[in-house]
């Protein structure tokens, strides 16, 4: 079980857009700088999210991307499904089944875990994510990402 960089970076971008939701569009370069994601990769992710109506784009000098709906109406599951072409990719890292085929006990446990992950992703909205990050004080940590050069 793992999230690809597509989902990880996509969720980071959506988090940034959710923080700025009522303020209008956010430039790709500002998200790129804040989250340390290349502009070209970020544009690919945001274009994919745009095709699925999770974000909107605005052209021009003050343009950028914004959420197409409120943060409380977009779940993490919505984002992951778009970026992973469904949820199956999230569960692709199944444990080795061994030389005698799949172990039914492992398969049962793995299925339950996959179901719980889906439940959590589908029950957690972008608004929930923003509130949880703030509640835990992680927003301050995210604000102070330092780059050291030796």
Where do the model's predicted regions map?
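Conserved segment of winged-helix/HTH DNA-binding domains
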Residues: 71-95, 114-115
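N-terminal helix-turn-helix DNA-binding core of bacterial DNA-binding proteins
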Residues: 3-5, 15-37, 66
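Residue cluster at the C-terminal edge of the helix-turn-helix DNA-binding motif
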Residues: 51-54, 82
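Beta-hairpin "wing" of winged helix-turn-helix
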Residues: 54-62, 66-67
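Key DNA-contact positions within bacterial/archaeal DNA-binding proteins
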Residues: 40
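C-terminal regulatory/oligomerization modules of transcriptional regulators
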Residues: 97-150
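Basic amphipathic alpha-helical segments that dock to polyanions
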Residues: 45-50
